[in-house]
Amino acid sequence: MSAQAAERDLTAIIGLEVHVQLETDTKIFCGCSTDTDDADPNTHTCPVCLGLPGALPTLNEGAVEAAVKLGKAIDADIPERTRFHRKNYFYPDLPKGFQITQYDAPICQDGELEVGTADDRRAIGIERAHLEEDPGSLQHVGGSIEDADYTLVDYNRAGTPLMEIVTRPDFRAAEEVRSFLAKLTSVLEYLGVFDAERDGSLRVDANISMVDSAELAGEGGPSDDVLEAANRTEVKNISSHRAAQKALAYETTRQRNQLERGMAVAQETRHWDEARGVTVSMRSKEEEKDYRYFREADIPPLEVSDWKDEIPIPELPDARRERFRTEYGVGDETASKLTSRKAVADLFEELADEYDAALAATWVADNVLGELNYRDLSLDDVADRDDEFERLVELVAEDEITAKNAEEVVLRTMLDEDRAPDEIVDAEGLGKTSGDAVADAVAEAIAENPDAVADYHDGEGDALNFLVGQVMAKTGGSADPGQVNELLRDELAQA
């Protein structure tokens, strides 16, 4: 590596094409069900989604409403009229030989989505968002896309409504991309148009170039000349927030190393290999002209202006976070955790309205989410247990068990063994110990630890904590720590 090459100060320019499957009962241009997760291959198909001659598409109104909701959420321009085009290319998962999509008149244009914290926020530009149909899915048998023995095609997915969201090249690091995707999917989930838990519901194509940092000086982002001069690599097969961060971190490093060695970066499409943690060259990158777009004659232009104002949107994550801060007194970091997923926010609000808001925030944001994250689960995976989480918080709020036992024993056992809170409390004898039993444990702790008693009288602060721990151990953690502390002080004053 030459000294001159090693001194180059390079910055990544990253833009995204995010494909999200919309939550509709039927496909975008036919009446086939989209509920295909457990279906046998090629059983949710019809002449329309198989592209048979003479089959005519009928636009799904629910998909259009979902797109309008997103447009409102990102403050995009929703034109009065939109239309569809055919994007022509050959691939086995596309039975018609073209994809019905939108080209020069997308349903949403010029929006933005804010990311970051309350003290450090910035807007990511969204150039456009348009509707299109999902292709079928490929199953590579005996290997990956590079070395499979053969590939099978399942057309159950063909025709599932997709929203493609195209950002401006506003990202400079892989971590920013992950943050944006988390925020975007949260907004879509709040809108009720996206199921984050559904396999394959999110797919990301990322375009990345490396340029000299000096070319990015000033405001307004990279100029058109800078973007034109930089060879752009597209990375496909990204299916999660985490994969996006890994893939772009790898690709940034790969391109940086090539440029610093004086090598050119090819304009190509690369495949993210999740198992190996690398991107692999697939083909030279297509240009827009390669797709030979022309209007879809079987779907007339769509007039959106007549009814777009009648489509409501619910409270979104940012507004809900701010309301949690003002209405419940929750800190910004905790409020962000609580509103990151709609199911989490709903659980917190239900508990906060019934019990103490601070207790509810601690339990949901720290205890429940922390335990689920440790198990690589989400609240959706245990959605049928909301009543049990509420009962556990009630036991703590009503002073029936200690917070320590609730977190360290009951919650973990609930998740490990699929048992109800009351059953665990009874079986493990975790009900709070009180009255004479606590007084006896206090007396025993004082009698058995004369050195700690002496240290307490000598002003050693840790001595009291030690004695509290001894009492808690004798009661199996079921005594109230505050009561134990008070009883110990009273008894030690007389010792």
UniProtKB/Swiss-Prot annotation:
The EC number(s) this enzyme carries: 6.3.5.-
SUPFAM superfamilies: GatB/YqeY motif, Glutamine synthetase/guanido kinase
InterPro entries per the UniProt record, alphabetical: Asn/Gln-tRNA_amidoTrfase_suB/E, Asn/Gln-tRNA_Trfase_suB/E_cat, Asn/Gln_amidotransferase, Asn/Gln_tRNA_amidoTrase-B-like, GatB, GatB_C_1, GatB_Yqey_C_2, Gln-tRNA_amidoTrfase_suB_CS
Domain of life: Archaea
The keyword Cell membrane is assigned to this record: no
UniProt keywords, alphabetically: ATP-binding, Ligase, Nucleotide-binding, Protein biosynthesis
Top EC class of this enzyme: ligase
Molecular-function GO terms, alphabetical: asparaginyl-tRNA synthase (glutamine-hydrolyzing) activity; ATP binding; glutaminyl-tRNA synthase (glutamine-hydrolyzing) activity
Keyword ATP-binding carried by entry: yes
Disulfide bonds: none
GO BP, sorted A to Z: glutaminyl-tRNAGln biosynthesis via transamidation; translation
Reaction(s) catalysed by this chain's protein: L-glutamyl-tRNA(Gln) + L-glutamine + ATP + H2O = L-glutaminyl-tRNA(Gln) + L-glutamate + ADP + phosphate + H(+); L-aspartyl-tRNA(Asn) + L-glutamine + ATP + H2O = L-asparaginyl-tRNA(Asn) + L-glutamate + ADP + phosphate + 2 H(+)
Function (record text): Allows the formation of correctly charged Asn-tRNA(Asn) or Gln-tRNA(Gln) through the transamidation of misacylated Asp-tRNA(Asn) or Glu-tRNA(Gln) in organisms which lack either or both of asparaginyl-tRNA or glutaminyl-tRNA synthetases. The reaction takes place in the presence of glutamine and ATP through an activated phospho-Asp-tRNA(Asn) or phospho-Glu-tRNA(Gln).
Complex and partners: Heterotrimer of A, B and C subunits.
UniProt record similarity statement: Belongs to the GatB/GatE family. GatB subfamily.
Designated name of the protein: Aspartyl/glutamyl-tRNA(Asn/Gln) amidotransferase subunit B
